[in-house]
Amino acid sequence: MNTASHDTVRALEWRDEGLYLLDQRLLPDQEQYLCCADAASVAQAITDMVVRGAPAIGVAAGYGAALAGAAAWRTHGSGWQAGMAEDIDTLRRSRPTAVNLGWALRRMEAFAARLPEDQDPAPALLAEAQAIHEEDVAANRRMGRSGAGLIQPGSGVLTHCNTGSLATGGLGTALGVIRTAWADGRVERVFADETRPWLQGSRLTAWELAADGIPVDLLADGAAAALMRTGQVQWAIVGADRIAANGDVANKIGTYAVALAARQHGVRLMVVAPTSTIDLATPAGEQIPIETRDAREVLYAGGRRIAPESEAVGAWNPVFDVTPAELVDVIVTERGVVHQPDADGIARLFEGAG
């Protein structure tokens, strides 16, 4: 497997003046792309989890902002900068926890503010969105190489949720590390939690790894601790939707349980995320907004209700949880690696950054 030219899966691509998103709700049964021709449809696709994963959401938001600017020029002419504000706000509200979303929109807004108001901004905005996409592809490769170098040959690894090409613009974050380590002969066995209730592990991660010819064993989320106790796993490798300034990590629900089990059983925990996922404005995990989704996602599976039909039966459905920094052994970013992360280590990643 050549990770340098990896292009097995594309979660999103720009063509024919629109953003095409691989509809991840339909995988692995159907590979169908949804075309988004305006910012509102991009925002709805993010909310509905057509596209998911913090880096991919950020890339999609960049393209959504480009569509917003193009539409504002057509409608308002020289007033396009003010005209795109409503669409930007709609995009910003689409998913509250993934910080890459806000990061990409702030970057696009700042770029738009530097453009002349009396010229069509569409080509320049599209080029900036494509730059965000290309930078994510490059960051994935750097993180994959850095993270793989920490893994000893013959290791077993466990991952949670989906952090591959479906969740990013390129190779993946945590799954990018696993792909690279597999290609290097460092990983002997890959385990993936099924990741209820959306089953991103069994539907998406297993699908990606199978496409690459990498064997993977799925397990129920509740089996992770028992697996670690057997000694078959040396690393738990996960992504992140937001990392606070002190190193606390918000990620897919169940990550905290994986981290606790890993610490109990001597398994090291690696978090892999681009620096756009780090929110220096959020001091600690307690301040990270945690999205809660519809109870039906827990009460139903495959379109069929699996819980009793009773008003007495409800569901609690937070999408993310927060893992304290003290449970994290290493955070891998495109700018460097932070061992035993804390506020000082996180801050050093941004030293000299423009």
Swiss-Prot record:
EC number from the UniProt entry: 5.3.1.23
Pathway: Amino-acid biosynthesis; L-methionine biosynthesis via salvage pathway; L-methionine from S-methyl-5-thio-alpha-D-ribose 1-phosphate: step 1/6
Catalytic activity: 5-(methylsulfanyl)-alpha-D-ribose 1-phosphate = 5-(methylsulfanyl)-D-ribulose 1-phosphate
Gene3D superfamilies: translation initiation factor eif-2b, domain 1, Translation initiation factor eif-2b, domain 2
One function term, GO molecular function aspect: S-methyl-5-thioribose-1-phosphate isomerase activity
Coiled-coil residue windows: none
Function: Catalyzes the interconversion of methylthioribose-1-phosphate (MTR-1-P) into methylthioribulose-1-phosphate (MTRu-1-P).
Similarity-based family: Belongs to the eIF-2B alpha/beta/delta subunits family. MtnA subfamily.
Name of this chain's protein: Methylthioribose-1-phosphate isomerase
